[in-house]
Amino acid sequence: ILLISLTTLQSCNDDTDDGLPYGGPVEPATNTIVDIASGAENLSILVSALEKSDLISTLSGQGPFTVLAPSNEAFNTFLNDNGFNNLEDVPVDILTNILLNHVVGGRLASTDLTTGYATTFAISSASPASMSIFIDITNGVKFNGVSSVSTADISADNGIVHLVDAVIELPDVVTFAVADPTFSTLVAALTRDDLTTDFVGVLSTATGTSPAPFTVFAPTNDAFGSLLSELSIAGLADIDEPTLDAVLKNHVVAGANVFDTDLTDNLTVSTLGGDITANVTGGATLTDSSGRVSDIIATNIQANNGIIHAINKVILP
């Protein structure tokens, strides 16, 4: 169910006697998102899931909401892939958060969507923050690299519905690295088959199990391109395994979900590869042991087991 930032509705008139917005009762939505789902045969499992998770009243509210609605086939695939015989086997807390991972505040028509990140109503287990969702519109519309829009722009009085062909499970930091083409070189580095460290396995660890949660300072493709020029080499294959392993560890903080607001000037940040220094005056930066400075260019991409900040220069040991 969808993306973007959760908004808080506030009264526009503090002087009203009844405390309701605009000085009077709000007319209930008459053709809600729930009404639309209830009237669609291929969304019957979604409706049952909303009932089990006690989200019917939420999505019958004023909104507006954007809902990514998985089809019955999508739900059946999700249940089979995760070893559940039926919807009743899914723990309520998990099901609720997965459903909220398909909901974004606001009415986002397909023409409003752009490639990038938005914020869902799902809450990360690594922090009190709502989780991000990655939208890619380069070839249709896809969410987190796994779920595509099959039918768009079904309008409701309290928002809009897009039917999707797969349940969007709760993302980990690897999910976003793989889904976002900005990090394709990073993914190629993390998955090089000669590495001693299984970075994908480590960074897929769920919160509650060491060494999660994680903070990942993720170099963009351009950052890796600049590194190759700096080192006068042709590609990642020219970096020996011990060096690449050490470089990648320098971008991972284990055991902490560090927001950009947690960074301060001259803050020592301990990564798996050693200490780096954060500064925030004039813009957030990271300085490695050689004095090389990397700018943090995108912040707070929140996953279920940690957080990602994009950087414009690779951090060296």
Where are these regions (language model features)?
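Sec-dependent N-terminal signal peptides
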Residues: I1-S5
